[in-house]
Amino acid sequence: MFEPNMLLAAMNNADSNNHNYNHEDNNNEGFLRDDEFDSPNTKSGSENQEGGSGNDQDPLHPNKKKRYHRHTQLQIQEMEAFFKECPHPDDKQRKQLSRELNLEPLQVKFWFQNKRTQMKNHHERHENSHLRAENEKLRNDNLRYREALANASCPNCGGPTAIGEMSFDEHQLRLENARLREEIDRISAIAAKYVGKPVSNYPLMSPPPLPPRPLELAMGNIGGEAYGNNPNDLLKSITAPTESDKPVIIDLSVAAMEELMRMVQVDEPLWKSLVLDEEEYARTFPRGIGPRPAGYRSEASRESAVVIMNHVNIVEILMDVNQWSTIFAGMVSRAMTLAVLSTGVAGNYNGALQVMSAEFQVPSPLVPTRETYFARYCKQQGDGSWAVVDISLDSLQPNPPARCRRRASGCLIQELPNGYSKVTWVEHVEVDDRGVHNLYKHMVSTGHAFGAKRWVAILDRQCERLASVMATNISSGEVGVITNQEGRRSMLKLAERMVISFCAGVSASTAHTWTTLSGTGAEDVRVMTRKSVDDPGRPPGIVLSAATSFWIPVPPKRVFDFLRDENSRNEWDILSNGGVVQEMAHIANGRDTGNCVSLLRVNSANSSQSNMLILQESCTDPTASFVIYAPVDIVAMNIVLNGGDPDYVALLPSGFAILPDGNANSGAPGGDGGSLLTVAFQILVDSVPTAKLSLGSVATVNNLIACTVERIKASMSCETA
């Protein structure tokens, strides 16, 4: 839709419509010039020229004197009355009037045309007069306000003020500086409570020479860092594009679509064994977003898969920012549509163009997120397939500089029989990843963290999950299977919210206002706190979260099976208190038996302790696995299982993210490499949001996560022995 010739055609079409719209008015002006007897200066149309309009004048006798007929008063009154009822009489009505008034049909036709022109001119003169008066009033008001600003005085000192000379940008900067001063005072007060030392002793509280990397900070070295108030946050500094930016965005998007199609369809010499040849790429695509910045590393990957979803639904997911960020919650920590330049044509997304911002994540606090500002363009190809492409727009928003640039990245979606689709995905980015922890450097550098294979694997698994939500042919023969359709949907929706909350809290995203606390001991454990108020999906009070990542020489599949199995839960779950864990109900949501949502009951060994329910979702694909769980109220779960609204069930999810380390030869003999395991807990330490957090609570949570890690390592080492 945004090819130049198509835009030009649209403009020509608009000009053509304007020409047709003014055609009758141009004709009327011609009648008015030639038939001036119908003007107000000639008794309001009381005369008419014999033979009709002046346009019918014989060209051979141009100087022949015109002959006029004056309409009678009765004729004028009758036509005036008819005009009030119907200003545009049809041919039949004109003939009837001509018979009644003893006039020619053409005389009646020309009288009505001239009358309409006369009324139009009258209305235009009246409107112009009104606009001139309004303009004059606004001009006087503007002058009065300018004089008031020029003569303004300070109420404190009586001297002149600088308001009249202050620019809008300067005024906004003053407001922002005041807000930042208040924020610094607030953070300083929090830091003083927990470290007992002046904040000035901590250099990270003052502006550093380089942008700080929160993920490399030792827990004992900083008094407080508020996530979500980072002045270097790219996404918060981005604004919607201006009108002058839009042609640039259109050109970039059209070129990116052409580049994506070639990246998808061409193999040699552009791709060699799934690796992009950078020199061949530069020769093939000399245009684009410019050369790679110094210090940035290029990542390029391509992957294909057949998924169980209609191609139209996949396009809708990609073009709806809410659906996109929900489906890819493990990759997208936050996303926003800043502007919609086109919604598409013919009732679909063909030609749709959006300007977006997004933050991409790895489920670990040791990997910085990747913020990017880009355009997303959707186009239907000639063979009926669909393509969706992203292209960075960081040249339009140079400050602060983006640490990640998306070259033409996206996917080609081809329709297959029986509701299936073939998706071919290309990821091509340039990134400054010097802040990645050494534990994850190999995984990130090989493309396993953010590459095309990760995106396709998530899409494939989520398509299976959505298919299970819509399934109606559910077998009731297996014990514990939930067959109630409404209950299944409510429980899956609750589990989806639990997974999104877990992924959002465990990564290094700056979107969430968490505060890092000092004095927790181990440097590899990240402890954060926040207050939960008026959130029906969370219990009210002070929520404490702890997360850590570590390597274990066990293949991801074995780690996943161990953690999701209720029979081995008491080997690592301290909160189960040695009780027996039993699966009460489950919903399978994929081909892999590990992809399911379960409702677990912990029968405590202590008879005085009431039984506890745990909602758990386990999901796995070749690139990542998750085991996420949360204690739930029995009464609330009964409502959910009967199809009730799950949004009001309070959840504090905890769990595990399991990623392959990317080394196929490491780990146990005969295995598939080691695992990068992230453990995260969220615990309500006080039900009063205004209560003060005790250091004892921080130490307790820190000990809990450390003990859990040791138990997992011990159990895994026993299995590998």
Curated annotation (Swiss-Prot):
Q: In which tissues is it expressed?
A: Expressed in hairless cell files of the hypocotyl epidermis. Expressed in shoot apical meristem (SAM) with higher levels in L1 cells and the epidermal layer of young leaves. Expressed in primary root tips, in the L1 of apical inflorescence meristems, early flower primordia, carpel epidermis, ovule primordia, nucellus, chalaze and seed coat.
Record's subcellular location: Nucleus
Keywords, A to Z, come to: Coiled coil, DNA-binding, Homeobox, Nucleus, Transcription, Transcription regulation
Compositional bias annotation for Basic and acidic residues: 21-34
Q: Record's PROSITE patterns?
A: HOMEOBOX_1, HOMEOBOX_2, START
Q: What happens when the gene is disrupted?
A: The double mutant pdf2-1 hdg2-3 exhibits abnormal flowers with sepaloid petals and carpelloid stamens in association with a reduced expression of APETALA 3 (AP3) in the epidermis and internal cell layers of developing flowers.
Which stretches does the entry tag as region Disordered?
17-70
Protease as a keyword of this entry, yes or no, is no
Q: What is its main location?
A: nucleus
A cellular component term, taken from the record's GO annotations:
nucleus
SUBUNIT field: Interacts with AIL7/PLT7, ANT, BBM and AIL1.
- The protein's name in its UniProt record: Homeobox-leucine zipper protein HDG2
